[in-house]
Amino acid sequence: MRVLENVQPQKVFYYFEELAWIPHGSYHTKAISDYCMNFAKERELEAYQDAYNNVVIIKEATAGYESAEPIILQGHLDMVCEKENDTEIDFENEGLRLFIDGDFVKAKGTTLGGDDGIAIAYALAILDSDEIAHPRLECVFTVDEEVGMLGAEKIDLSMLKGHQVLNIDSDVEGTFLTSCAGGVTAECSFPLVFDEAEGLQYRLTLTGLMGGHSGGEIDKERANAIVEIGRILKHLDDTLEMGKIGRASCR
């Protein structure tokens, strides 16, 4: 029995649940990419899949909209895979366990994958409909967005005719953004020399912070565990020898 069969828009959440059953964390998008390609093949839609698992699906305009400007619908196939400490799940081989909590759709003990599964679900629902009038639709599904826009960097979009892009990757209903938070990833290498440590050893762990997303909460001045650990270390005795600094799995 489907969990979301009575959630509206029904067709959108039908596809969202379909996608939730397919493991699709970053770097593991082959299965969900193949699902989208099979979807297109069953409906005889023009579709492309590259070696990186990016997918483009094209549906020609309905009657009366042949001369209208094509619309590009864009979302990403990968999700952030995080779980609660007491949850057992193999994200590479198991789908999500959805449930309804009041007005919210949630996943048991894990992230939901709404970012950006809902975008793919919207696009598939529109592509599947015979009742929605539309210009030529060009649906672009990229991979590994959560780890650095890797799919977007590699994708070939030479088959597209549209110039108007709707990127479906925001979290506020009814709000349209014409901006981007941006992001920078720095990889640094330093020459290190390891010696046997003497004296007492201590583990310092900082947890329980509110957290947040730099795209939406960067101005809230919330504590960042990495920054705060750095401040603590800066004020400790200079004779302290550091062994290792680590952080959680999410950036």
Regions found by a protein language model. Name each.
Residues D50-Y52, T142, I245:
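Conserved beta-strand termini and adjacent loop/short-helix elements that scaffold enzyme active sites
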Residues A20, A40, E44, C81, ...:
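Structural signal for hydrophobic packing residues in well-ordered secondary-structure cores
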Residues P23, G95-R97, D101-K106, T110, ...:
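Midchain, well-structured core segments that form catalytic/ion-binding scaffolds
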Residues Y65-V147, A152-K154, M159-H163, Q201:
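Active-site metal-coordination/substrate-binding segment of hydrolases
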Residues S33, D116-I120, I226:
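Short alpha-helical patches at coil-to-helix transitions and adjacent helical residues
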Residues C36, A40, I120-L127, I155, ...:
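Buried hydrophobic packing segments
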Residues R2-D103:
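Acidic/His- and Gly-rich active-site-bordering loop/insert found
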